[in-house]
Regions:
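Phosphate-moiety recognition in structured ligand-binding domains
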Residues: 2-41, 48-53, 179-183, 305-306, ...
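Generic alpha-helical structural element
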Residues: 29, 33, 40-43, 85, ...
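Conserved phosphate/anionic-ligand binding catalytic regions in large, soluble enzymes, centered on
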Residues: 37-40, 46, 83-99, 261, ...
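Active-site phosphate/pyrophosphate-binding segments
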Residues: 42-43, 54-71, 76-77, 179-307, ...
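Residue-level detector of alpha-helical secondary structure
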Residues: 43, 50-53, 99, 153
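Short coil-to-helix leader/linker segments, especially the first N-terminal amphipathic alpha-helix
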Residues: 49-63, 106-114
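Glycine-rich phosphate-binding loops that contact phosphosugars or nucleotide phosphates
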Residues: 75-228, 309-348, 353-357
Length: 412
Protein backbone atom coordinates (compact mmCIF):
# COMPACT_ATOMS: atom_id res chain seq x y z
CA UNK A 1 0.00 0.00 0.00
CA UNK A 2 1.50 3.32 -1.11
CA UNK A 3 1.32 6.49 0.96
CA UNK A 4 2.28 10.04 0.05
CA UNK A 5 5.85 11.03 0.81
CA UNK A 6 6.52 12.82 4.08
CA UNK A 7 8.12 15.64 2.09
CA UNK A 8 4.83 16.34 0.26
CA UNK A 9 2.77 16.07 3.45
CA UNK A 10 5.01 18.41 5.45
CA UNK A 11 5.33 20.99 2.67
CA UNK A 12 1.55 21.09 2.16
CA UNK A 13 0.97 21.70 5.86
CA UNK A 14 3.70 24.38 5.99
CA UNK A 15 2.41 26.25 2.92
CA UNK A 16 -1.14 26.36 4.25
CA UNK A 17 -0.21 27.32 7.82
CA UNK A 18 2.04 30.13 6.61
CA UNK A 19 -0.69 31.61 4.44
CA UNK A 20 -3.31 31.37 7.17
CA UNK A 21 -1.38 33.80 9.32
CA UNK A 22 -0.64 36.25 6.53
CA UNK A 23 -2.70 37.09 3.47
CA UNK A 24 -4.93 35.30 1.01
CA UNK A 25 -5.76 36.94 -2.32
CA UNK A 26 -3.62 39.96 -1.38
CA UNK A 27 -5.79 40.63 1.65
CA UNK A 28 -5.27 40.07 5.36
CA UNK A 29 -7.73 37.82 7.16
CA UNK A 30 -9.38 40.82 8.83
CA UNK A 31 -9.91 42.53 5.46
CA UNK A 32 -11.40 39.35 4.01
CA UNK A 33 -13.83 39.17 6.92
CA UNK A 34 -14.98 42.74 6.24
CA UNK A 35 -15.52 41.82 2.59
CA UNK A 36 -17.52 38.71 3.49
CA UNK A 37 -14.89 36.54 1.81
CA UNK A 38 -12.85 34.92 4.60
CA UNK A 39 -14.65 31.54 4.62
CA UNK A 40 -14.50 31.02 0.86
CA UNK A 41 -10.88 32.19 0.68
CA UNK A 42 -9.85 29.71 3.36
CA UNK A 43 -11.75 26.89 1.67
CA UNK A 44 -10.04 27.55 -1.67
CA UNK A 45 -6.60 27.78 -0.09
CA UNK A 46 -6.86 24.61 1.98
CA UNK A 47 -7.59 22.31 -0.97
CA UNK A 48 -4.10 20.86 -1.56
CA UNK A 49 -4.09 19.75 2.07
CA UNK A 50 -7.59 18.33 1.71
CA UNK A 51 -6.48 16.27 -1.30
CA UNK A 52 -3.80 14.77 0.88
CA UNK A 53 -6.42 13.91 3.51
CA UNK A 54 -8.82 12.51 0.91
CA UNK A 55 -6.09 10.24 -0.43
CA UNK A 56 -5.22 9.00 3.05
CA UNK A 57 -8.90 8.31 3.77
CA UNK A 58 -9.11 6.32 0.55
CA UNK A 59 -6.04 4.27 1.47
CA UNK A 60 -7.49 3.56 4.92
CA UNK A 61 -10.67 2.21 3.27
CA UNK A 62 -9.00 0.46 0.35
CA UNK A 63 -9.77 -3.05 1.57
CA UNK A 64 -13.47 -2.23 1.98
CA UNK A 65 -13.58 -0.55 -1.45
CA UNK A 66 -11.98 -3.49 -3.22
CA UNK A 67 -14.17 -6.02 -1.42
CA UNK A 68 -17.35 -4.10 -2.29
CA UNK A 69 -16.53 -3.71 -5.99
CA UNK A 70 -15.13 -7.21 -6.49
CA UNK A 71 -18.27 -8.68 -4.91
CA UNK A 72 -20.43 -6.87 -7.46
CA UNK A 73 -18.19 -7.76 -10.40
CA UNK A 74 -18.29 -11.45 -9.48
CA UNK A 75 -22.09 -11.44 -9.73
CA UNK A 76 -22.49 -9.62 -13.04
CA UNK A 77 -20.80 -9.68 -16.44
CA UNK A 78 -21.63 -6.04 -17.13
CA UNK A 79 -22.21 -3.23 -14.64
CA UNK A 80 -23.48 0.27 -15.31
CA UNK A 81 -22.09 3.01 -13.07
CA UNK A 82 -24.15 6.20 -12.97
CA UNK A 83 -22.64 9.31 -11.39
CA UNK A 84 -25.24 11.72 -10.07
CA UNK A 85 -25.57 14.84 -7.97
CA UNK A 86 -27.20 18.26 -8.01
CA UNK A 87 -25.51 21.48 -9.11
CA UNK A 88 -21.75 21.36 -8.61
CA UNK A 89 -22.04 17.75 -7.43
CA UNK A 90 -23.37 16.91 -10.90
CA UNK A 91 -20.21 18.31 -12.47
CA UNK A 92 -18.05 15.79 -10.60
CA UNK A 93 -19.36 13.09 -12.92
CA UNK A 94 -19.05 15.33 -15.98
CA UNK A 95 -15.42 15.85 -15.05
CA UNK A 96 -14.39 12.19 -14.61
CA UNK A 97 -16.70 9.82 -16.52
CA UNK A 98 -14.96 10.04 -19.91
CA UNK A 99 -11.58 9.22 -18.39
CA UNK A 100 -12.90 6.23 -16.48
CA UNK A 101 -14.46 4.85 -19.66
CA UNK A 102 -11.07 5.17 -21.36
CA UNK A 103 -9.11 3.27 -18.72
CA UNK A 104 -11.60 0.54 -17.75
CA UNK A 105 -12.72 -2.60 -19.60
CA UNK A 106 -16.01 -1.53 -21.19
CA UNK A 107 -17.02 -5.13 -21.72
CA UNK A 108 -17.57 -5.33 -17.97
CA UNK A 109 -18.08 -1.82 -16.57
CA UNK A 110 -19.35 1.39 -18.15
CA UNK A 111 -19.66 4.88 -16.73
CA UNK A 112 -22.26 7.55 -17.41
CA UNK A 113 -23.20 10.76 -15.67
CA UNK A 114 -26.53 12.50 -15.18
CA UNK A 115 -27.58 15.18 -12.75
CA UNK A 116 -29.99 14.11 -10.04
CA UNK A 117 -32.24 16.93 -11.26
CA UNK A 118 -32.52 15.10 -14.61
CA UNK A 119 -32.68 11.65 -13.06
CA UNK A 120 -35.64 12.67 -10.92
CA UNK A 121 -37.45 14.51 -13.70
CA UNK A 122 -36.82 11.91 -16.45
CA UNK A 123 -35.99 8.62 -14.68
CA UNK A 124 -36.93 6.29 -17.55
CA UNK A 125 -34.37 8.00 -19.79
CA UNK A 126 -31.52 6.76 -17.61
CA UNK A 127 -32.59 3.77 -15.50
CA UNK A 128 -33.24 0.28 -16.83
CA UNK A 129 -34.68 -2.44 -14.63
CA UNK A 130 -32.58 -5.29 -16.04
CA UNK A 131 -29.14 -3.61 -16.01
CA UNK A 132 -27.17 -4.05 -12.75
CA UNK A 133 -26.34 -0.51 -11.68
CA UNK A 134 -24.05 1.21 -9.21
CA UNK A 135 -25.53 4.62 -8.42
CA UNK A 136 -22.75 6.92 -7.21
CA UNK A 137 -24.21 9.88 -5.32
CA UNK A 138 -22.04 12.98 -4.88
CA UNK A 139 -23.26 15.40 -2.23
CA UNK A 140 -21.77 18.05 0.01
CA UNK A 141 -24.62 18.12 2.52
CA UNK A 142 -26.41 14.94 1.52
CA UNK A 143 -29.71 16.74 2.01
CA UNK A 144 -30.60 18.06 -1.44
CA UNK A 145 -34.17 16.96 -2.26
CA UNK A 146 -33.26 15.74 -5.74
CA UNK A 147 -30.29 13.69 -4.49
CA UNK A 148 -32.49 11.91 -1.96
CA UNK A 149 -35.25 11.37 -4.50
CA UNK A 150 -32.83 10.01 -7.11
CA UNK A 151 -31.87 7.20 -4.73
CA UNK A 152 -35.47 6.29 -3.98
CA UNK A 153 -36.43 6.31 -7.66
CA UNK A 154 -33.43 4.13 -8.57
CA UNK A 155 -34.43 1.65 -5.87
CA UNK A 156 -37.93 1.61 -7.31
CA UNK A 157 -36.90 1.06 -10.95
CA UNK A 158 -33.65 -0.98 -10.95
CA UNK A 159 -33.83 -4.67 -10.02
CA UNK A 160 -30.20 -5.00 -8.90
CA UNK A 161 -29.07 -1.67 -7.49
CA UNK A 162 -25.89 -0.93 -5.57
CA UNK A 163 -24.78 2.42 -4.25
CA UNK A 164 -21.60 4.32 -3.51
CA UNK A 165 -22.29 7.42 -1.44
CA UNK A 166 -19.51 10.03 -1.57
CA UNK A 167 -20.43 12.90 0.72
CA UNK A 168 -18.87 15.49 3.02
CA UNK A 169 -21.46 15.47 5.85
CA UNK A 170 -21.65 12.43 8.15
CA UNK A 171 -24.93 13.73 9.58
CA UNK A 172 -26.52 14.24 6.15
CA UNK A 173 -29.48 12.13 5.12
CA UNK A 174 -27.57 10.29 2.38
CA UNK A 175 -24.79 9.31 4.79
CA UNK A 176 -27.20 8.22 7.52
CA UNK A 177 -29.17 6.11 5.04
CA UNK A 178 -25.97 4.35 3.91
CA UNK A 179 -25.02 3.19 7.39
CA UNK A 180 -25.58 -0.53 7.84
CA UNK A 181 -26.57 -1.06 4.20
CA UNK A 182 -24.29 -3.76 2.76
CA UNK A 183 -25.21 -2.69 -0.79
CA UNK A 184 -24.18 0.93 -0.15
CA UNK A 185 -20.51 1.87 0.26
CA UNK A 186 -20.21 5.10 2.26
CA UNK A 187 -17.08 7.15 1.59
CA UNK A 188 -17.00 10.22 3.82
CA UNK A 189 -14.74 13.06 2.76
CA UNK A 190 -12.36 15.09 4.97
CA UNK A 191 -14.20 17.21 7.53
CA UNK A 192 -12.74 20.37 6.01
CA UNK A 193 -14.31 19.58 2.65
CA UNK A 194 -17.80 20.24 4.02
CA UNK A 195 -17.62 23.85 2.86
CA UNK A 196 -19.16 26.37 5.22
CA UNK A 197 -19.29 29.02 2.51
CA UNK A 198 -21.99 29.15 -0.13
CA UNK A 199 -19.82 27.89 -2.97
CA UNK A 200 -18.71 24.28 -3.32
CA UNK A 201 -14.91 24.32 -3.55
CA UNK A 202 -13.09 21.66 -1.51
CA UNK A 203 -16.15 19.43 -1.59
CA UNK A 204 -16.07 19.40 -5.40
CA UNK A 205 -12.39 18.60 -5.69
CA UNK A 206 -12.27 16.02 -2.89
CA UNK A 207 -15.29 14.06 -4.14
CA UNK A 208 -13.77 14.07 -7.64
CA UNK A 209 -10.46 12.73 -6.37
CA UNK A 210 -12.06 9.99 -4.30
CA UNK A 211 -14.20 8.76 -7.19
CA UNK A 212 -11.16 8.66 -9.48
CA UNK A 213 -9.20 6.61 -6.96
CA UNK A 214 -12.09 4.22 -6.38
CA UNK A 215 -12.89 3.44 -10.02
CA UNK A 216 -9.53 3.79 -11.76
CA UNK A 217 -7.60 0.55 -12.40
CA UNK A 218 -4.30 2.40 -11.86
CA UNK A 219 -1.78 0.94 -9.42
CA UNK A 220 -1.45 2.44 -5.97
CA UNK A 221 2.02 3.67 -6.94
CA UNK A 222 0.53 5.56 -9.89
CA UNK A 223 -2.24 6.98 -7.73
CA UNK A 224 0.24 8.22 -5.13
CA UNK A 225 2.37 9.85 -7.82
CA UNK A 226 -0.59 11.59 -9.41
CA UNK A 227 -1.93 12.84 -6.08
CA UNK A 228 1.48 14.17 -5.06
CA UNK A 229 1.71 15.97 -8.39
CA UNK A 230 -1.72 17.65 -8.21
CA UNK A 231 -1.00 18.77 -4.64
CA UNK A 232 2.20 20.45 -5.82
CA UNK A 233 0.58 21.97 -8.90
CA UNK A 234 -2.43 23.21 -6.94
CA UNK A 235 -0.20 24.86 -4.37
CA UNK A 236 1.77 26.54 -7.14
CA UNK A 237 -1.41 28.05 -8.61
CA UNK A 238 -2.23 29.50 -5.19
CA UNK A 239 1.30 30.88 -4.89
CA UNK A 240 0.80 32.73 -8.20
CA UNK A 241 -2.38 34.52 -7.19
CA UNK A 242 -0.92 37.82 -8.40
CA UNK A 243 -1.30 36.60 -11.99
CA UNK A 244 -4.99 35.96 -11.41
CA UNK A 245 -5.46 39.30 -9.65
CA UNK A 246 -3.90 41.14 -12.58
CA UNK A 247 -6.29 39.27 -14.88
CA UNK A 248 -9.32 40.18 -12.76
CA UNK A 249 -8.21 43.83 -12.67
CA UNK A 250 -8.91 44.07 -16.41
CA UNK A 251 -12.08 45.78 -17.63
CA UNK A 252 -14.49 42.90 -18.28
CA UNK A 253 -18.17 42.15 -17.78
CA UNK A 254 -18.32 38.67 -19.34
CA UNK A 255 -16.35 35.45 -18.87
CA UNK A 256 -16.38 32.34 -21.04
CA UNK A 257 -14.71 29.07 -20.08
CA UNK A 258 -13.82 26.58 -22.81
CA UNK A 259 -12.80 22.94 -22.52
CA UNK A 260 -13.18 19.58 -24.25
CA UNK A 261 -13.95 16.19 -22.73
CA UNK A 262 -13.67 16.33 -18.95
CA UNK A 263 -12.67 19.96 -19.26
CA UNK A 264 -16.15 20.65 -20.66
CA UNK A 265 -17.61 19.58 -17.32
CA UNK A 266 -14.95 21.63 -15.56
CA UNK A 267 -15.84 24.66 -17.68
CA UNK A 268 -19.47 24.18 -16.60
CA UNK A 269 -18.41 24.32 -12.95
CA UNK A 270 -15.99 27.22 -13.49
CA UNK A 271 -18.64 29.43 -15.08
CA UNK A 272 -21.12 28.53 -12.35
CA UNK A 273 -18.65 29.62 -9.66
CA UNK A 274 -18.24 33.11 -11.04
CA UNK A 275 -21.98 33.38 -11.72
CA UNK A 276 -22.78 32.37 -8.13
CA UNK A 277 -20.16 34.44 -6.34
CA UNK A 278 -20.89 37.62 -8.29
CA UNK A 279 -24.68 37.02 -8.10
CA UNK A 280 -24.89 37.38 -11.87
CA UNK A 281 -23.11 40.73 -12.01
CA UNK A 282 -20.69 39.09 -14.43
CA UNK A 283 -22.29 37.19 -17.30
CA UNK A 284 -20.85 33.72 -17.90
CA UNK A 285 -20.86 30.95 -20.48
CA UNK A 286 -19.15 27.62 -21.07
CA UNK A 287 -18.55 25.67 -24.27
CA UNK A 288 -16.18 23.29 -26.01
CA UNK A 289 -13.51 24.81 -28.27
CA UNK A 290 -15.07 23.24 -31.37
CA UNK A 291 -18.63 24.04 -30.29
CA UNK A 292 -17.80 27.68 -29.63
CA UNK A 293 -17.89 28.65 -33.30
CA UNK A 294 -21.43 27.36 -33.73
CA UNK A 295 -23.20 30.42 -32.34
CA UNK A 296 -21.81 30.88 -28.79
CA UNK A 297 -18.92 32.94 -30.16
CA UNK A 298 -21.48 35.75 -30.46
CA UNK A 299 -21.05 36.16 -26.68
CA UNK A 300 -17.67 37.88 -27.14
CA UNK A 301 -17.44 41.65 -26.97
CA UNK A 302 -14.61 43.97 -25.96
CA UNK A 303 -15.33 43.35 -22.26
CA UNK A 304 -14.99 39.57 -22.31
CA UNK A 305 -12.42 37.24 -20.76
CA UNK A 306 -11.93 33.96 -22.60
CA UNK A 307 -10.31 31.21 -20.50
CA UNK A 308 -9.48 27.87 -22.11
CA UNK A 309 -8.50 24.66 -20.31
CA UNK A 310 -5.92 23.14 -22.66
CA UNK A 311 -5.50 19.39 -23.02
CA UNK A 312 -2.36 17.29 -22.62
CA UNK A 313 -3.59 15.13 -25.49
CA UNK A 314 -1.63 16.16 -28.60
CA UNK A 315 -4.55 15.57 -30.96
CA UNK A 316 -7.07 17.51 -28.87
CA UNK A 317 -4.60 20.32 -28.24
CA UNK A 318 -4.52 21.14 -31.97
CA UNK A 319 -8.17 22.18 -31.74
CA UNK A 320 -7.44 24.17 -28.57
CA UNK A 321 -4.71 26.12 -30.34
CA UNK A 322 -6.82 26.67 -33.47
CA UNK A 323 -9.59 28.24 -31.41
CA UNK A 324 -7.16 30.37 -29.41
CA UNK A 325 -5.63 31.72 -32.61
CA UNK A 326 -9.02 32.45 -34.13
CA UNK A 327 -10.31 34.39 -31.10
CA UNK A 328 -6.96 36.16 -30.67
CA UNK A 329 -6.96 37.08 -34.35
CA UNK A 330 -10.47 38.53 -34.11
CA UNK A 331 -9.05 41.16 -31.76
CA UNK A 332 -12.33 41.67 -29.90
CA UNK A 333 -12.02 40.00 -26.48
CA UNK A 334 -10.40 41.89 -23.62
CA UNK A 335 -8.08 38.94 -22.93
CA UNK A 336 -7.68 35.30 -24.00
CA UNK A 337 -5.88 33.00 -21.57
CA UNK A 338 -5.05 29.33 -21.96
CA UNK A 339 -4.21 27.17 -18.96
CA UNK A 340 -1.82 24.35 -19.86
CA UNK A 341 0.61 21.88 -18.34
CA UNK A 342 3.45 23.05 -20.57
CA UNK A 343 3.96 26.00 -22.89
CA UNK A 344 1.53 26.04 -25.81
CA UNK A 345 3.29 26.26 -29.15
CA UNK A 346 1.83 28.05 -32.14
CA UNK A 347 -0.29 30.68 -30.42
CA UNK A 348 0.13 34.26 -29.26
CA UNK A 349 -2.70 34.01 -26.71
CA UNK A 350 -1.72 34.48 -23.07
CA UNK A 351 -0.62 31.22 -21.48
CA UNK A 352 -0.73 30.32 -17.77
CA UNK A 353 1.62 27.33 -17.55
CA UNK A 354 1.45 25.02 -14.55
CA UNK A 355 4.53 24.11 -12.56
CA UNK A 356 6.80 21.37 -13.85
CA UNK A 357 5.35 17.86 -13.73
CA UNK A 358 1.93 18.45 -15.21
CA UNK A 359 2.84 17.49 -18.77
CA UNK A 360 2.78 13.79 -17.94
CA UNK A 361 -0.62 13.80 -16.26
CA UNK A 362 -3.84 12.43 -17.73
CA UNK A 363 -6.16 15.37 -18.46
CA UNK A 364 -8.49 14.43 -15.62
CA UNK A 365 -5.80 15.24 -13.07
CA UNK A 366 -5.12 18.65 -14.64
CA UNK A 367 -8.66 19.56 -13.59
CA UNK A 368 -7.44 19.94 -10.00
CA UNK A 369 -4.99 22.84 -10.45
CA UNK A 370 -7.20 24.27 -13.20
CA UNK A 371 -10.22 24.52 -10.89
CA UNK A 372 -8.19 26.33 -8.23
CA UNK A 373 -7.36 28.93 -10.87
CA UNK A 374 -11.05 29.27 -11.77
CA UNK A 375 -12.16 29.47 -8.14
CA UNK A 376 -9.59 32.21 -7.57
CA UNK A 377 -10.94 34.15 -10.54
CA UNK A 378 -14.41 33.81 -9.03
CA UNK A 379 -13.68 35.07 -5.54
CA UNK A 380 -11.55 37.94 -6.82
CA UNK A 381 -14.28 38.92 -9.28
CA UNK A 382 -16.88 38.90 -6.50
CA UNK A 383 -14.72 41.19 -4.39
CA UNK A 384 -14.22 43.46 -7.40
CA UNK A 385 -18.02 43.59 -7.89
CA UNK A 386 -18.48 44.36 -4.19
CA UNK A 387 -20.48 41.17 -3.71
CA UNK A 388 -20.08 38.95 -0.62
CA UNK A 389 -18.51 35.61 -1.67
CA UNK A 390 -19.44 33.81 1.56
CA UNK A 391 -23.12 34.79 1.22
CA UNK A 392 -23.43 35.91 -2.41
CA UNK A 393 -27.20 35.91 -2.88
CA UNK A 394 -28.37 39.37 -1.70
CA UNK A 395 -32.04 38.41 -2.03
CA UNK A 396 -31.68 35.04 -0.30
CA UNK A 397 -33.45 33.34 -3.21
CA UNK A 398 -30.48 31.02 -3.86
CA UNK A 399 -29.55 28.80 -0.92
CA UNK A 400 -26.58 26.69 0.13
CA UNK A 401 -28.91 23.67 0.23
CA UNK A 402 -31.71 23.96 -2.32
CA UNK A 403 -35.17 24.64 -0.90
CA UNK A 404 -38.69 24.63 -2.27
CA UNK A 405 -38.41 21.50 -4.44
CA UNK A 406 -41.57 19.39 -4.61
CA UNK A 407 -40.84 15.71 -5.27
CA UNK A 408 -43.78 14.07 -6.99
CA UNK A 409 -44.47 10.35 -6.52
CA UNK A 410 -43.44 8.07 -9.38
CA UNK A 411 -45.99 5.48 -10.41
CA UNK A 412 -44.53 2.53 -12.32
Amino acid sequence: MTLLSEQVINKTKTDYNQRQGEVMFRLAKEELEKLGASITAKEIFQQPGLWQEAYQLYVSQLEAVESFLSGIKEKHDLIQVIFTGAGTSDFVGQRIANYLNQVNDLKHIRFSTVGSVELVGRPYDYLQADIPTILVSFARSGNSPESLAAVEIAKQLVDELYQVTITCAPEGKLAVAAEGDTDNLLLLQPAGSNDKGFAMTGSFSCMSLTALLVFSPASQEENAHWVETIIRLGQDVLDREDYVQDLVNLDFERVIYLGAGGFYGLAHEAQLKILELTAGKIATMYESPLGFRHGPKSFINNKTLVILFASNDAYTRQYDVDLLNEVHGDGIAERIVALSADKLAGTEAANFVLAEGGAGLPDVFLTFPYIIFAQTVSIMSAIKCKNLPDTPSPTGTVNRVVQGVIIHPLEK
